[in-house]
Regions:
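Glycine/proline-rich, positively charged
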Residues: 1-59
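Generic structural signal for well-ordered alpha-helices
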Residues: 2-6, 27-31, 61, 115, ...
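Active-site-adjacent beta-strand anchor residues
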Residues: 20-21, 75, 127, 146-149
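Terminal-tail/helix-coil boundary detector
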Residues: 66, 90-124, 139-143, 153, ...
Length: 204
């Protein structure tokens, strides 16, 4: 497969190649094989990533940053859940994507906590909650592009306007804190070790 993709790049049929929905070890294996054999390597990863679904940060984001891979985000509003139309104590409104297809999988409690934090920020900027969710994504260094799934012209225009929203450092801190993932091993051990190493040595 990698040789076939390489042939397509070398012949000019495609400019860059990317992959989608793979584990970090699979991505790294493909990159390493391409490098070892002088083949065109993957340049991008297409993956699910939202303020309410940051699992990608455990393994894939560090890998992409290290290997200089761009991230193309799919379902940046978690299947419409982060548009703000669905309320914490109610079902998804009729006609919305979530009403007929409850996908992608998301921790709804975390999602609604994020929505609660995004609403006052959206009000302060005079924009929709959806724009804040997209602006947060666009602020992430690893994100190269966001694949939006608007159903109407109004939704499309609203989504596109998110590129003009500039979140302040305080706003980003609030959003990062409310959406932060709990550390799992080896993450908490690496953080602990990093703290020890960063501490200045003391002398008697």
């Amino acid at each position: 497969t990698l040789e076939s993709l390489n042939d397509m790049v070398r012949s000019g049929k495609v400019r860059y190649i990317g992959l989608c929905n793979l584990a970090a070890w699979q991505v790294m294996k493909a990159v390493a094989i391409s490098k070892a054999n002088g083949l065109a390597r993957f340049q991008s990863v297409q993956a699910y990533y939202t303020i309410a679904g940051r699992e990608l940060e455990r393994e894939l984001v560090p890998l992409m940053e290290d290997q200089k891979l761009g991230l193309m985000v799919w379902s940046p509003l978690a299947g419409g859940l982060l548009s703000g139309r669905t309320k914490r104590d109610g079902a998804a409104p009729e006609g919305t994507r979530r009403a007929t297809f409850d996908f992608p999988v998301v921790d709804k409690q975390r999602a609604f906590n994020c929505l609660d934090a995004m609403q006052p920020i959206a009000d302060a900027h005079g924009v929709s909650v959806a724009q804040i969710a997209l602006a947060w994504l666009l602020s992430r260094p690893v994100v190269s592009s966001v694949i939006i799934g608007a159903k109407t012209i109004e939704q499309l225009n609203d989504n596109l306007a998110s590129s003009n929203v500039k979140l302040t450092s305080d706003e980003l801190r609030i959003l990062d804190e409310v959406s932060q993932l709990p550390r799992e091993y080896p993450g908490w051990m690496l953080a602990l070790q990093g703290g020890y190493r960063a501490a200045a040595p003391t002398r008697d």
